[in-house]
């Protein structure tokens, strides 16, 4: 079968999913329809905002469906009418069997980890938070349990000690577009030899990648300096690690921290204690050193470098970060 004859339905929502869709369209593959999340109000004005995948589909006149419920009969019928040979899922939702089992060649997913590691909603964040030095991207066929299907292909990349989640996200996004094309071509050529995940070698224990909530992002200053440093970069710039900054009167505000340095050092200060000259630097004590805060954000303010913030905010060593 030629690629022009292979009927592909594509499912995805965020920017991460646009790259692979763009690679398919620009590569001359036959994308017969796109499925994305319903429109949602966003921002302070609650204006209706299209998902990045919807915007791309509209810009390129691709047929589009935005089901509220994936088991809805009208949606299922509309999907059947597209007569897909293959479905591709990138950063979308958990699909019911009636959807993923529909095409004759199956449905494959692009997942931003080296499966079976980091099954779940936030694999890039957790790989950085856990201080991993390597991650990657995987294509696999869908089955009942989430992120457990047979692996088709994988690509590995290093994680530098200075990478934050945005940098790793963008690297994987670009790699993912190419891997989707390679996977489609392998399926077209009948060269796929998928591997059950339980047969794949894994270094160390399996780690999950659960969805990240606000409380997940609270910094625990009782942790070692490297752990806190990795935690901050694993949540930067979004959704952002945060802590409560407590003034001498005991009043607290939430401060988001985006960039830091690790400064291992022996000291006797309590975790969360602040060391600052009030002008140029802000360091927070942890048991085995200090976290040097390089950029942060106060409520209702924009993100600033530490020295910029200190010029407009009178911070002394009588302040502290709530250790948790």
Curated annotation (Swiss-Prot):
Transmembrane annotation, as ranges: none
Top-level enzyme category: transferase
InterPro entries associated with the record: Fmt, Formyl_trans_C, Formyl_transf_N, Formyl_transf_N_sf, Formyl_transferase-like_C_sf, Met-tRNA-FMT_C, Met-tRNA-FMT_N
Ubl conjugation listed as a keyword: no
Keywords: Protein biosynthesis, Transferase
One of the record's GO molecular function terms: methionyl-tRNA formyltransferase activity
Domain of life: Bacteria
Record-level GO cellular component terms: cytosol
Function: Attaches a formyl group to the free amino group of methionyl-tRNA(fMet). The formyl group appears to play a dual role in the initiator identity of N-formylmethionyl-tRNA by promoting its recognition by IF2 and preventing the misappropriation of this tRNA by the elongation apparatus.
Name of the protein described by the UniProt record: Methionyl-tRNA formyltransferase
The organism of origin for this protein: Bacteroides fragilis (strain ATCC 25285 / DSM 2151 / CCUG 4856 / JCM 11019 / LMG 10263 / NCTC 9343 / Onslow / VPI 2553 / EN-2)
